[in-house]
């Protein structure tokens, strides 16, 4: 495991940087510092109330453990990760893959879990998005309805904190006028301003209005090696999904040499849809509302020794 400190500007400064970038991509933009809403309430229903306290980002495993061929031996545990990053009992959100050993299939994992510590058991409110074997539609399930463990597999991008209330960055945008998706626009805004000073943000956002393109990995791993982005896209199942979507997002402005996935967002809903977010498909009507917090520390866990850039979108 490797770790380093992020550059952590003030919340007010980050607001200003994000706003300047978002205005090039959305017609209506508001970015302010505010008290984190109670995220234990609808529609989020997290096991904690906030996104604050000892914030950090963990990049675990990586795409090279999925493509060209899956490494099914790569199994990780949320409680172990929380301890490894010095935060037992952490609230963890983000995007990753399920463990084949836990579920007997491949699927998208949408993290929302409070890890265990000496005094509490883990509270896992994560979701699993898989391809319905009956009709090929998306099947969204609560992780706890499938398994009682807290494992995941292959790769994940996680934001961890104490789950406390506190000040966060609220981002509200409507009507997309540029080409970048919501997350890419924010990440690129930070990169343009801070350059090689890595800034990491994690949080949750709502697709309040409109629709978005998402993918879900098939239950069966590819029989043929996935050597190119075209191979990967041919294997994935793509869907257009409707609002409201609750999206768990982790993004980093600059990779300081750790072979990071710079952005990764997975979504769940209360109407049975979820998966890996790509971009909205309804620019004229789209509306996003998000709450984010900068991470203080970066942890790189089980970095693949042989890497590539396939399948990073």
Swiss-Prot record:
Quote the Pfam families the UniProt record gives: DUF1907
Query: What is the name attached to this protein's record?
Result: Ester hydrolase C11orf54 homolog
Return the SUPFAM superfamilies for the record. AF0104/ALDC/Ptd012-like
Classify the source by domain of life: Eukaryota
What job does the chain carry out? Answer: Exhibits ester hydrolase activity on the substrate p-nitrophenyl acetate, in vitro. May regulate DNA damage and repair by regulating HIF1A degradation via chaperone-mediated autophagy (CMA).
Residues binding Zn(2+), per UniProt:
264, 266, 276
Top-level EC class, please?
hydrolase
Keyword match Acyltransferase: no
Task: List this protein's GO terms for biological process.
Answer: DNA damage response; regulation of DNA repair
> What are the subcellular locations of this protein?
Nucleus; Cytoplasm
Tell me if Cytoplasm is a UniProt keyword of this record.
yes
Task: Cite the CDD domains for this sequence.
Answer: DUF1907 (cd17298)
- Taxonomic lineage of this organism? Eukaryota, Metazoa, Chordata, Craniata, Vertebrata
Identify the EC number(s).
3.1.-.-
GO cellular component labels: cytoplasm; nucleus
List keywords of the entry alphabetically: Cytoplasm, Hydrolase, Metal-binding, Nucleus, Zinc
Q: Name one GO molecular function term.
A: zinc ion binding
Quaternary organization: Monomer.
Q: Which cofactor does it need?
A: Zn(2+)
Q: Which PANTHER family match?
A: ESTER HYDROLASE C11ORF54 (PTHR13204:SF1), PTD012 PROTEIN (PTHR13204)
- What InterPro entries has UniProt attached to this entry? C11orf54_DUF1907
């Amino acid at each position: 495991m490797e770790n380093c400190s992020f550059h952590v500007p003030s919340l007010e400064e980050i607001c200003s940087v994000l706003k300047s970038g978002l205005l090039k991509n959305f017609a209506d933009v508001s970015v302010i510092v505010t008290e984190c809403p109670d995220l234990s309430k609808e529609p989020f229903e997290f096991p904690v109330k906030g996104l604050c306290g000892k914030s950090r980002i963990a990049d675990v495993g990586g795409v090279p453990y999925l493509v060209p061929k899956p490494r099914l031996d790569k199994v990780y545990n949320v409680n172990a990760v929380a301890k490894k990053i010095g935060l037992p009992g952490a609230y963890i959100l983000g995007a990753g893959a399920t463990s084949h050993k836990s579920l007997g299939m491949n699927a998208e994992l949408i993290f929302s879990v409070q890890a265990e510590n000496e005094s509490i058991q883990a509270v896992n409110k994560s979701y699993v998005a898989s391809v319905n074997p009956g009709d090929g539609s998306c099947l969204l399930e609560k992780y706890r309805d499938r398994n009682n463990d807290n494992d995941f597999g292959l790769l994940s991008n996680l934001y961890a904190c104490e789950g406390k209330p506190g000040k966060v960055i609220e981002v509200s945008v409507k009507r997309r006028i540029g080409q970048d998706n919501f997350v890419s626009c924010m990440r690129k805004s930070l990169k343009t301003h801070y350059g090689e000073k890595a800034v990491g943000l994690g949080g949750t956002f709502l697709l309040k209005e409109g629709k978005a393109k998402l993918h879900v990995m098939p239950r069966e791993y590819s029989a043929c090696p996935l050597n190119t982005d075209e191979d990967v896209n041919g294997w994935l199942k793509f869907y257009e999904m409707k609002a409201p979507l609750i999206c768990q997002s982790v993004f980093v402005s600059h990779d300081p040499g750790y072979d990071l996935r710079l952005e990764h967002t997975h979504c769940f809903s209360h109407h049975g849809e979820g998966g890996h977010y790509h971009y909205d498909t309804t620019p004229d009507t789209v509306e996003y509302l998000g709450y984010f917090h900068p991470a203080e520390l970066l942890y790189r866990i089980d970095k693949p020794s042989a890497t590539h850039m396939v399948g990073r979108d």
